[in-house]
């Protein structure tokens, strides 16, 4: 005779809860990217672990070439001070942009020997969901800030066939070799330049020097505005090309219009035997 076994309600409820949790976790897995749409490095970033509870900068720099080039830099005391400051911000309930895993986006996506152009910004955008580790760029779905709108306007007049995209994500430039570096890599939410004096510029000045000294091919540096112009002293101008213009901010837009820095950049790249940037590939 078969014997009926009754499973207690508490176990049935636990099993149902487990299934619901499993379904929820499945919904949170990032959607797969269609083949060919993004390179392997982008895919890795989309599938990376959740944001760390403690910020350790070296662990966030996953680009192999940059990890080697900056290995000694991460051993210096000022890096520990930056980490201490950032962790203090988080512990105080302050929001930091970009999220920790996106601080080094431009480093993690663009290997050192693939750099052909460097664009230097000042610090990340400080409003919600804007900054993601590329200077002047914002995430898709976020309205382009005024400076980026002016960049697009100049491109429309400078580059034949350029049509303003419906987003502000400049990842397409990074894929082509444009290293988009902010001098300061983090900012407190809604407070511009709030992290300008915590040590980041010591780090990014070192990065600029490394690019200048160790790049085997001429690099085009686009320096927009007085702040970026000061970085010229870090660059070997006998080896590399520096194009200085006004900043695309509305405050200096009159001098920005007509600068034609994008076509000039491509001319310099072609003169050195390198591929021009397809600025419309966004």
Swiss-Prot record:
The disruption phenotype is: Severe loss of unracil exision activity. Increased number of germ-cell corpses in response DNA damage induced by ionizing radiation.
The catalytic residues are 123
Q: InterPro entries, alphabetically?
A: UDG_fam1, Uracil-DNA_glycosylase-like, Uracil-DNA_glycosylase-like_sf
**Tell me, what is one Gene Ontology molecular-function annotation carried by this entry?**
uracil DNA N-glycosylase activity
Where does the UniProt annotation locate this protein? Mitochondrion; Nucleus
From which domain of life does this come? Eukaryota
User: What is the reaction catalyzed?
Assistant: Hydrolyzes single-stranded DNA or mismatched double-stranded DNA and polynucleotides, releasing free uracil
Give the chief site where it resides. Answer: mitochondrion
Q: Does Mitochondrion show up as a keyword for this record? A: yes
DNA damage is among the record's keywords:
yes
Which cellular component terms (GO) are annotated to the entry?
mitochondrion; nucleus
Q: How is its activity regulated?
A: Inhibited by UGI, a B.subtilis bacteriophage PBS2 peptide inhibitor.
Its activity depends on temperature as follows:
Optimum temperature is 26 degrees Celsius.
Keywords linked to the UniProt accession: DNA damage, DNA repair, Hydrolase, Mitochondrion, Nucleus
E.C. numbers: 3.2.2.27
Q: Which stretches does the entry tag as region Disordered?
A: 15-40
- Could you give a single Gene Ontology term from the biological process aspect? base-excision repair, AP site formation via deaminated base removal
Which NCBIfam families does this UniProt record tie to the protein?
PRK05254.1-1 (NF003588), PRK05254.1-2 (NF003589), PRK05254.1-5 (NF003592), ung (TIGR00628)
Family as reported in the entry's similarity comment: Belongs to the uracil-DNA glycosylase (UDG) superfamily. UNG family.
Q: What does this protein do?
A: Excises uracil residues from the DNA which can arise as a result of misincorporation of dUMP residues by DNA polymerase or due to deamination of cytosine.
Q: What is this protein called?
A: Uracil-DNA glycosylase
Query: What organism does the record attribute this protein to?
Result: Caenorhabditis elegans
Task: List the lineage, top down.
Answer: Eukaryota, Metazoa, Ecdysozoa, Nematoda, Chromadorea
